[in-house]
Amino acid sequence: DANKTYTKLQTVGDRLTPVVRMEIEKMIFENQMIVVAYVPELPKNQKPCYITQKGRYEGAFIRSGDGDRRLSPYEVDRLAEGAFQPHYDIEPVAAASIDDLNKNTLTAIIRRARDIFPRVFATLPDETILIQLGVLTKVDDRICPTLSGLLVAGIFPQRFFPRLEVVFTVYPGVSKTGNEKTGVRYLDSKEIVGSIPDMLVETLTMVQMRMNTGAVLEGALRKDVPDYPLIAVREAVANALQHRDYSPDGRGTHVEVNMYSDRLEITNPGGLFGSTTIESLGKEGISSSRNEYLSRLLTYTPFESGYVVENKGTGFMVIESSLAQALMPPPKIQNSLTFFKLTFEKRRRTMIEMSNRSWEVIDEAIIAELTSRGSCSIKELMAMSGLSRATMTSHIRKLVRTGKVEPTENARSPKQRYRVVRNDHD
């Protein structure tokens, strides 16, 4: 009965917290009266919506398939964070002391802070600066590290939080079930520990060791191309460690970096935070940070020739740009209340690689290189192409025989080089 349904729907929203005002109307569809209700999405700072009588943890549901699923307490808490700025990243780690922090890293952070904000920090004592930045805090008149301080400068943070680590795994197939024929579940697995800079370095090293690097012809002879651009991987792993969920419930879950035969996945606990959406990733505008103190500290924390992050909301732009430059598709994004995942497709072999470089393509590349450089020796052409001496010599002899290339010296000269034959009217 459309009229009864219409009447009942008008009061449903009153039984929810916050109260939901639906747009309800009756209309004719295929000669039948139906009721259409539009339920506007609540702002993030008002979620989750729940049945008032059942309470927040028992009365909040999410649509799943053809049914409804009650949200877990973890999911409810993550939604509730939309109403405030979490400060889990500066909670004190009372069991730790300043002796658990790397002195060189602390010195670098202090120096960086004084360089950026000399009027604020130039005359302050080192300890005061570390407190102001959220590296240290006071608990009952005792100085101890914060969670952020431990993460950026800790010698071994996993002593206090064993699961705040990266687990890197290489699987032989396209799923975690492994190879059913051989029974091999994974080819390599490693727990990566230490501070965020330490984990980032080791994770990148493991990815580089386990992925393939191909050589393709580009214009003139050879260009090395990895399965995954390391710049993109670095940004993805850094973002996972920077923006993951560090709430007490989230500290039992690690960051996963999984390499399959066809893709690389980077997964962190906790979905996108605040105003950030999948659609806004990689776009210019205001960005949100779940861990604002940690994010700022990472801009002061040394890493290779710079710092761990820029904290300017450009990380995803760098990922997309580096993949585009490698002629690879954008990353696949999966986002939920409980996790965020980026998937990079493995670089597909080029036509040249699959055909093992056709004879004609190599000839064209040699001519292009000789034209560009003026002349080259056999040894130089071998180094640029990766081809053997016998193969390169065969190509050069053919090009000489067909009148496209000529030697610059006598046949047996140790200084022999080759150049493109000039036309008489050039």
Predicted segments with their positions:
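Short helix-coil-helix linker/hinge
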Residues: 357-365, 375
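Short, cationic-aromatic polyanion-contact patches
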Residues: 360, 407-426
